[in-house]
């Protein structure tokens, strides 16, 4: 009976103490079709050690891709407390993406720590994954007279809720409850639609 709580406590302590040294400057990217590329600043927050930052793009299913988007440079060294920059570049195949709705990809950064000179050291390479939305020209300039967000509906049916997103934009629902400030229902997981 003591083993399970001890393991749970250990897992909690480890999760609180682990955080990435190399982090992107935002939590999501929007790549407008009218832009040739977008830049992302990567920050090495470690006060003493340089890190390698490896970056790549994945499709909506989590498969690593090399087109229609690419990251340059794919690997770079970032010194302690310094910034690096990567460019997400559109390639010719980008014209094959739907022109009437957003497409979702994932931008990934893996930090690679320097080799330790201490014996018997476990090193962990942490990875950050953020959403990257490609937005076609038809969706770039939305009218504030009729915001697209007002078209997203929430319908209550007893204890259940149905969300309808008829728009060409992705909506992320990170939390839900039956009343303001309430707890989410058991088993609720964030979703993107």
Task: Please describe what each predicted stretch is.
Residues 12-17:
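N-terminal signal peptide c-region/cleavage motif recognized by signal peptidases
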């Amino acid at each position: 009976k003591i083993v399970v709580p001890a393991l749970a406590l250990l897992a909690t302590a480890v999760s609180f103490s682990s955080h990435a040294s190399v982090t992107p400057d935002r939590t999501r990217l929007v790549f407008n079709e009218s832009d040739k590329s977008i830049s992302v600043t990567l920050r090495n927050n470690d006060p003493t050690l340089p890190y390698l930052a490896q970056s790549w793009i994945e499709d909506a299913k989590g498969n690593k891709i090399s087109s229609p988007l690419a990251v340059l440079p794919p690997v770079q060294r970032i010194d302690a407390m310094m910034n690096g920059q990567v460019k997400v570049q559109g390639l010719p195949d980008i014209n094959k993406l739907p022109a009437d709705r957003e497409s979702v990809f994932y931008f990934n950064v893996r930090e690679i720590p320097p080799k330790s000179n201490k014996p018997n050291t476990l090193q962990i390479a942490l990875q950050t994954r953020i959403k990257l939305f490609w937005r076609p020209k038809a969706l770039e300039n939305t009218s504030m007279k009729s915001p697209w967000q007002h078209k997203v509906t929430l319908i209550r049916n007893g204890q259940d809720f149905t969300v309808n997103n008829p728009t060409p934009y992705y909506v992320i629902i990170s939390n839900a409850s039956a009343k303001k400030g309430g707890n989410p229902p058991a088993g609720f997981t964030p979703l993107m639609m």
